[in-house]
Swiss-Prot record:
GO terms for molecular function: phosphatidylinositol-4-phosphate phosphatase activity. It is an enzyme of class 3 (hydrolase). It is found in: Endoplasmic reticulum membrane; Cytoplasmic vesicle membrane. The gene is SAC7. It comes from the Eukaryota. It is a multi-pass membrane protein. This is Phosphoinositide phosphatase SAC7. The phosphatase catalytic core motif (or RXNCXDCLDRTN motif) from the SAC domain is found in metal-independent protein phosphatases and inositol polyphosphate phosphatases. Induction: By wounding. InterPro entries: SAC_dom.
Amino acid sequence: METVDSRNKLHSRLRLWEFPDQYIIEPADGSGSSCLDISRVDASMKLIDQVPESNSVRVPKIRSIFGVVGMLKLLAGSYLVVVTESERVGSFLGHPIFKVTTLKVLPCDHSLKNSPEEQKKMETEFSKLLSVAEKTTGLYFSYEVNLTLSSQRLHEMGDESKSLPLWRQAEPRFLWNNYMLEVLIDNKLDQFLLPVIQGSFNSFETAIGRDIVDITLIARRCTRRNGTRMWRRGADLDGYVANFVETEQIVQMNGYTSSFVQVRGSMPFMWEQVVDLTYKPKFEIVQPEEAKRIAERHFLDLRKKYGSVLAVDLVNKQGGEGRLCEKYATVMQHITGDDIRYLHFDFHQICGHIHFERLSILYEQIEGFLEKNGYFLLNEKGEKMKEQLGVVRSNCIDCLDRTNVTQSMIGRKMLEVQLKRIGVFGAEETISSHLNFDEHYKILWANHGDEISIQYSGTPALKGDFVRYGHRTAHGVLKDGWSSLRRYYLNNFADGTKQDAIDLLQGHYIVAVSRDMAPVPQKGGLEAVANFPVALFVVLMSFWFATMSLKQTGSDYKHKHLFFSLLWTGICVGMAALVRANGRIFCNRPRLHKPRG
């Protein structure tokens, strides 16, 4: 695979000099290139020949960094985002891949000293979100190869495109720091522009007979409607869906390279599930009259990018999910044709909670589509022998747990087909017949599912023990119970702030002085005083006082204690009922505005 022109090659080793009034980013890879000078006063940038001299007044702090992710501008200051720690996790088509282990946000906000107090206060609120952003997980990058494109799309690129800087080759929807790079792009700093994807990257190498086979699984998360589980559901008016992830499985052996791509994404019409302290908030379809147009736009985009599309819907046909399932099926009746097909498979009804081997029923229904649309294959000379002509699009409600089990099954079946085509497997041979290979392959998909799930829900994937071990385990069931409780807590009491941080980082919310300095509308009624920790404290204390008073009813003042017991019980029940009836108000909700566009 050809890579970027050496003239546009990224700096792989950098040294950061933190002076009181400026940041200097010095290439430390022996290239002799210019240094990047960034003002800590106004965030202006320029290239300089060498690092300025230090003295007793200007003593710099020096550290190694591994890339410049970008810059964000808030009300008064700007903030530089850099990679301070990373680890190599494998290779993509022969090129090293690294995972971001630590992000650091560096303020360029000295001008804030002269700002009005109200502006300083607002700046502090926004900068707190950046500390949340520093904890972003699942970020990967390469200095040499474009991670945003699949193997097939990389192969189809022309020589002229391959000579461009990596950021210019990148697929914008999978470029996690697309918005943050804009300032650096404007300053023509190509060698400092590090493209980053969010998703997962896992690989392993194993021997099958005399052959060494390398298997890679890479996920690319779309940034168009990125967010948290409960605050990003369904689609927007442009047809971009929540939790859209492209998963590519690559096998390399004896010079052959073969890949197979699948996608997942939320049901492509407008629906929501707003948290309200209940375990399963009800589903609501929004603007149902727009559903057909939105779904049509979504699938036309998929067809343009991937070819034929088979939409596999895994949601329940009954209960709360049933309404969404019915709407999806109705919408698809107007869209399906030769190139777009829809198939419903009630995962829970057919497989229950333990019989996931029944997914073979689904495979029998989609096998024809997979055979017809195939996979991508290059021979030892780098010549294209096959190309993938279509894609399976899977979804459940979250596009996490059921989806990951299903995608791992499809990936396994297609890998066996690829290995037979390359000549590694015989006609009747399967992955299961090679125990070491089978074990590593299960772990590969389980880790993939966990990482995608953590980014969207905050916890590892449910049902992951089946993917990891091939069957359900008692430990896996207990782990799923704990993860479900954690999801409940995060959804209700943490994800609103996390959603704001995501929107800020990816440019879905642009900070503007004219808007963000305007007076905040005064909250009225219950919303002005709603505070869940305080309400919980009142409920618990009321319960405690009611219990203590009840214990004293046998004393001389039993009527008095009985009265207080009933009083505290009433307060306890009343507060609990108030919180339950107004659950949405007591939850942690996003505070920023609509996405741009």
